[in-house]
Amino acid sequence: MKSKIVVDSSSNVYELPDVGFACVPLKILADEQEYVDTAEVDAPALAEKMRTYKGRTSTSCPNISDWMAAYEGADEVYVVTITGTLSGAYNAALLAGEEYEQSHEGARVFVLDSLSTGAESRLLVERLAALIKAGKPFDTVCEEIRAYHEHTHLLFALESLANLARNGRVKPAVAAVARMLGIRVIGQASDAGDLEVICKTRGEHGALERMVLEMKAHGLTNGRVHIDHCCNAAAAERLKHMVHAVFPEAKVEVGTCGALCSYYAEYGGLMVGYEDNEAPTV
């Protein structure tokens, strides 16, 4: 039986060694130009453009055919999508899974709504890979990734809310006030998959301190932490050191946002996925 992990590009995972893998890109539209979120797109250049761009922008998710093509060649497919509250990717992946099972005798497709995006999705993808490499059967993998998902979390710190406002995720007035006052917004992915604001801070140091406090409050001890940044490597490294100062056994990695996450996190933004202390092991 051939296994395959399939994700959309909001996970910032474009390749995964030693397992069957496919990444299905989301797209960003700006200034009549389409940016396909692959490893080749210049995400920092896109983020720089969005800093001054005043026109209309939008995003689009993979369709059923895109997902079907990604599933091809596998008998057991494990899918992780961006939260269904932000995108239709989850529903499209589900429908594609039903069609794939009908047209491929014996095939099985499991679709997990991450209820999140970015760095938390990457934790889920990496755990799926570990479960597959451990040789666990399909139903066990599905059961264990659901259990693991109960103990992963997403935090974000944003310097700008412009693109979230353009797409109806926050009120334009809130975005304007945040920009004028130099406020950084700290938020999280809720249990329902909504991106919700926790607090607002002034200055980068205060934002990073609050993120560490939130991780502590949600049970981080010696677990894994992924920090993805949009054109803000210095802040990401600083946060890594701050996390290690409080949680010296935590396994912290720093990465970069792809195009879709750069679009929403915007220039200077940070996205942090982490495990709490009750996360099960493989």
Language model region names:
Residues 3-4, 10-22, 26-27, 32-33, ...:
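Mixed-charge interfacial surface used for oligomerization/domain docking
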Residues 33-102:
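Class I S-adenosyl-L-methionine
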Residues 105-107:
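A short helix->loop->beta-strand "cap" motif at the edges of active sites that frequently abuts
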Residues 81, 110-111:
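A glycine-rich beta-strand to alpha-helix segment
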Residues 1, 19, 72-75:
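Structured loop/turn residues at beta-strand edges in well-structured enzyme cores
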